Amino acid sequence: MGKVRAVCISEKRGTQKKNIESAVFVENWGIEGDAHAGNWHRQISLLSEETIAAFKARGAEVTDGAFGENLVVSGYDFTKFPIGTRFTCKDVVLELTQIGKECHHGCEIFQKMGECIMPTNGVFAKVLHGGKISVGAVSYTHLRAH
């Protein structure tokens, strides 16, 4: 079980996301108003609160959304879940589609810290069923049988 700690969006690509506390998740699209929403496999990005806290402990000065993550969730190590894992949070159902990503060359965090956690700890999902998620909501996992 996990708990949502931040819900973040950015209206333009290339800008840091901001915690808006609550958002509408649209089936096969992403978060309403987020620049990265669309009909593709990386509609939602997720990071664990624990991973962010460990990075901050090494001196990183980051806020929710700094890594481009849409959801910050406590209680999960997202890298331990296989592709296809489903997360439910109220009515919303997300399916894990990708683990990690290549950091872009202009990554401010990488330039300051010499590393970034998104390439190894960030995960991506698509929205299978829409609804609203707010900070404090509880999330459950469902491993898909292969």
Which positions does each model-derived feature cover?
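Short, structured beta-strand/loop micro-motifs enriched in basic residues and often containing a Trp
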Residues: 67-76, 116-126
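Hydrophobic beta-sheet segments that form the core/acyl-binding groove
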Residues: 88, 139-140
